[in-house]
Amino acid sequence: NPASCCSCADVDPGRASRKTPKGEDQVFIKEKDRC
């Protein structure tokens, strides 16, 4: 599932910002081929 990728990304058009359990902002790459 591309949406659940856990690879961190720098500013990227395909990124998705999420909150970690600690409340920190974490960025994930959506494209599966970039995980």
From Swiss-Prot:
Organs and tissues of expression: Expressed by the venom duct.
Post-translational modifications reported in the UniProt record: Contains disulfide bonds.
Region annotation (Disordered) ranges: 1-35
Cellular compartments annotated: Secreted
Superkingdom field: Eukaryota
Taxonomic lineage from the root: Eukaryota, Metazoa, Spiralia, Lophotrochozoa, Mollusca
Segments of skewed composition (Basic and acidic residues): 21-35
The protein's name in its UniProt record: Conotoxin TxMEKL-0422
Keywords associated with the record: Cleavage on pair of basic residues, Disulfide bond, Neurotoxin, Secreted, Toxin
GO molecular function: toxin activity
Disulfide bond recorded as keyword: yes
GO cellular component: extracellular region
Main subcellular localisation: secreted
